[in-house]
Amino acid sequence: MKKSYRVKSEKDFNAIFNDKQSVANKRFVIYKLDKDQKHFRVGLSVSKKLGNAVVRNGIKRKIRHVLIEHRQELQAVDFVIIARKGVEELDYKETERNLLHVLKLAKIYQEGIPSEKEE
């Protein structure tokens, strides 16, 4: 995933959290901030409680893969995905199903509707 698709700075994370638009399901929490931009930006948070670095990086890799696969259908907003306990036990298909479910609840993902603006 290109750097332009990532939320990295503490300032950006705080702006998203302070906007207080959040949605959750059993496996993920999403905070979002509506912004006028060409494409989405995402920040990932996986707690040390979920496992060692290998496990946490595997979770982040699965999440990024889902986002890359469905990037054309994601709205141009900033959002942070927080992984909850139990996500480390999911295989890729279950992770994808759970993540797309919470993205739909947050109105970030719309199936079959390309939303990325022309660059």
UniProtKB/Swiss-Prot annotation:
It comes from the Bacteria. The keyword Transmembrane does not apply. The keyword Nuclease applies. One of its GO terms (biological process) is tRNA 5'-leader removal. Pfam families: Ribonuclease_P (PF00825). HAMAP family: RNase_P. This is Ribonuclease P protein component.
